[in-house]
Structure formats: structure tokens, C-alpha cells
């Protein structure tokens, strides 16, 4: 939403001689500053929430520095935790689940007595996915209680974000199998509004495995911060 934002934050290299994360600072930038151009990126889901932001000789006042000079990396990690928290649906304003798997299975599949073996297998997948989703919701409630008690759950954030984004992708794969061609509509009166929403949400689910840190990045974070596995060494 860079094209709609009034401000943005950015990590800038303020000490070229420092290595890796050191020498990075966090700035907030007024999007109305001369030389800034935000260009929306068209996504396969039909939305354009992502943008490319171009800077042409943009000047930012020194008092827009957040935190200590060269200390931006620590702040950036904290910001990422908030983003992962939101994407894991820990927040009190998380969106409700609009696509009930078992309800859609009842609507789009024939009665069990006349279903084929493949449809029986699909029913089992739908039930298993619904159970996983319910278990995840219970876990997020427990995690929310631990967060309110100010317990350290920073590493667990990556686990929950990883599980949620991968579960969402798998859920929509099951939805497509449940609904068949009815889940592949893009527009027009031949499809119900819910069917059109499923198609776009399915395409959008792929972005969830990238936003807030890709699934591969989350696995690395979990390995180092949660499991405390040695870095850069291979098990023999």
C-alpha cells in the first residue's frame, strides 16, 4: 500500500565500513517528499497491495531517525515480529474465516452413499484440514494469552507464521478440489460471489508464504532461535 501510505520506514546503510547487520539505521520517510514515486504491482489475485517505491535524490531530515544511529537492525526484527503476529492472526482484529471447508464439502459433493472412492478421500482431506485449522486457532488463543502475560514468544512467532501460511495454501488446494470448476471463475454472473472470492483468495494464498518473511526464512529462524541448531554446519 505504498501508493496510499503517508509515511514509510526504511533501513539505510549509515556505516559502509560495518559488516552485515551492523551499520544499518531505521528512518521514517514522508511519502510526499519530492522525488518519491510509488508504482503498484499487479498481482495474480487481481489486487495491487504491493508497490515498487522509487527514490530520486530524496532527502530525509536527520530527526526522522528512529532509535540509535546504526541500531536499525534490532528495530527491524521487532517490526517483523509484529508483522508475523498479524499474519498469524494473533491480533484481536484478525479476519474471520469466510470459507468453511465442511460446509462447502456438503454443498459441492454428492451424498456419501453415492460418492466415489476419490470423493471419499477428498472428504477425509477436508475433515483433516478442518481439524488442523481448528487446532491452529486454539493454539493462537493460547499464544495470545502467553503474549499478554509478557512471556517471550518471539521464536514461536515464526513457527505460527510458517504453519498458518502453509495451512492456508493447503486449505485452498482442498477447496479447489471440493468445488471443481466452480472455484475457477474470475468474473461474471455465471459464478456466485463466494466462488469468485475463493478463486482470488487461492491465488492470494501464495503470497502469504512470502510476506513477512518467506517460509524458507522462517525455517532458518526456527532452526537458529528455537531449536538452537549450529549455523553453517552439516550433520554427519
Model-found features: residue ranges?
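Alpha-helical scaffold segments that form or flank carboxylate-/histidine-based iron centers
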Residues: 120-128, 153-163, 199-204
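Glycine-rich phosphate/cofactor-binding loops in nucleotide/flavin-utilizing enzymes
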Residues: 75-91, 179-236
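Short, well-ordered loop/turn and helix-capping segments at boundaries between secondary-structure elements
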Residues: 13-17, 30, 34, 56, ...
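Glycine-rich beta->alpha junctions and the first turn(s) of the following alpha-helix
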Residues: 35-136, 208
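C-terminal helix-coil-helix/basic helical segment that borders enzyme active sites and/or dimer interfaces
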Residues: 110-113, 117, 134-190
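Tryptophan-centric aromatic hotspots in well-structured domains and transmembrane helices
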Residues: 7-9, 26, 50-54, 73-75, ...
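A short core secondary-structure module
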Residues: 1-39
Amino acid at each position: 500500500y505504498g501508493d496510499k501510505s503517508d509515511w514509510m520506514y526504511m533501513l539505510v546503510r549509515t556505516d559502509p565500513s560495518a559488516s552485515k547487520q551492523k551499520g544499518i539505521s531505521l528512518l521514517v520517510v514522508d511519502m510526499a517528499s519530492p522525488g518519491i514515486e510509488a508504482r503498484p504491482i499487479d498481482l495474480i489475485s487481481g489486487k495491487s497491495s504491493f508497490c515498487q517505491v522509487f527514490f530520486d535524490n530524496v532527502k530525509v531530515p536527520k530527526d526522522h531517525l528512529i532509535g540509535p544511529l546504526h541500531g536499525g537492525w534490532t528495530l527491524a526484527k521487532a517490526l517483523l515480529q509484529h508483522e508475523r503476529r498479524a499474519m498469524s492472526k494473533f491480533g484481536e482484529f484478525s479476519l474471520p474465516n469466510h470459507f468453511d471447508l465442511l460446509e462447502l464439502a456438503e454443498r459441492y459433493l454428492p451424498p456419501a452413499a453415492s460418492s466415489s472412492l476419490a470423493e471419499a478421500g477428498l472428504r477425509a482431506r477436508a475433515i483433516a484440514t478442518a481439524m488442523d485449522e481448528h487446532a491452529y486457532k486454539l493454539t493462537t488463543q493460547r499464544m495470545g494469552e502467553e503474549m499478554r502475560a509478557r512471556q517471550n514468544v518471539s521464536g514461536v512467532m515464526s513457527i505460527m507464521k510458517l504453519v498458518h501460511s502453509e495451512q492456508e495454501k493447503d486449505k485452498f488446494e482442498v477447496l479447489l478440489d471440493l468445488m471443481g470448476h466452480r472455484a475457477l471463475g474470475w468474473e461474471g454472473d455465471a459464478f456466485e460471489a463466494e466462488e469468485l472470492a475463493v478463486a482470488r483468495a487461492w491465488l492470494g494464498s501464495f503470497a502469504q508464504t512470502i510476506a513477512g518473511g518467506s517460509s524458507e526464512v522462517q525455517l532458518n529462524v526456527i532452526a537458529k532461535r528455537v531449536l538452537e541448531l549450529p549455523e553453517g554446519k552439516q550433520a554427519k
